[in-house]
């Protein structure tokens, strides 16, 4: 069970809504993933009507919607988008994204922290997408963010946990949930994130662009479950030396 702010989730896999070939395929993949929290970019939906091609099937699926501010380049733009989302969707939950460079889509740490502090004061439940910076993540936690979402690698790159060393520090010091977001390309990456202590992962591109998104979503669901179970089971510690799993000489001594 994962708790963030006032909500609890059975699934530790969060999913996105971009890059799917159709809305129907998107919903089928989300259902197959078991995800209960789904992000959607405000710039991709028509907030004036609930029969929007993306919004309507998500509402029907009964998932918790996490609107994001993707496309915002400044704190002011993100705050404006957040208020539009709250008014249109009736939720104060928000994935805060501010990335001024469209080529790399890396989060702006200064603008993100500034927007996060303001939005928390305005009553939003803020989950900020941020760099894998332990100092920044701690500052975001201190201003009241409900979770932190450090990147594993650039958005959509499928490179995996390239920031692993920093993620480990973030996880170790965090007192709010840590959701590894961006760069997760295959199910084994998700399993590794849960094994190392992350509370959840957010996956979009790896599922949406797969040859079979529904089966890939199932694979991610199983990987997240396996990673979490492995961590909870207490894996053995690493060693530089070999340790025999059975006696090496007992049968020789017995027959001497």
Curated annotation (Swiss-Prot):
Entry's Gene3D superfamilies? Aldolase class I
Q: In which pathway does it act?
A: Cofactor biosynthesis; thiamine diphosphate biosynthesis
Q: Name one Pfam family in it.
A: ThiG
Question: What keywords are assigned to this protein?
Answer: Cytoplasm, Schiff base, Thiamine biosynthesis, Transferase
Q: What is its EC number?
A: 2.8.1.10
Q: Where is the active site?
A: 95 (schiff-base intermediate with dxp)
Show the GO cellular component annotation of the record: cytoplasm
Q: Where in the cell is it found?
A: Cytoplasm
An example molecular function term from Gene Ontology annotations: thiazole synthase activity
Q: Which family does it belong to?
A: Belongs to the ThiG family.
**How does it associate, per the subunit comment?**
Homotetramer. Forms heterodimers with either ThiH or ThiS.
**Function in brief:** Catalyzes the rearrangement of 1-deoxy-D-xylulose 5-phosphate (DXP) to produce the thiazole phosphate moiety of thiamine. Sulfur is provided by the thiocarboxylate moiety of the carrier protein ThiS. In vitro, sulfur can be provided by H(2)S.
Under what name is this protein listed? Thiazole synthase
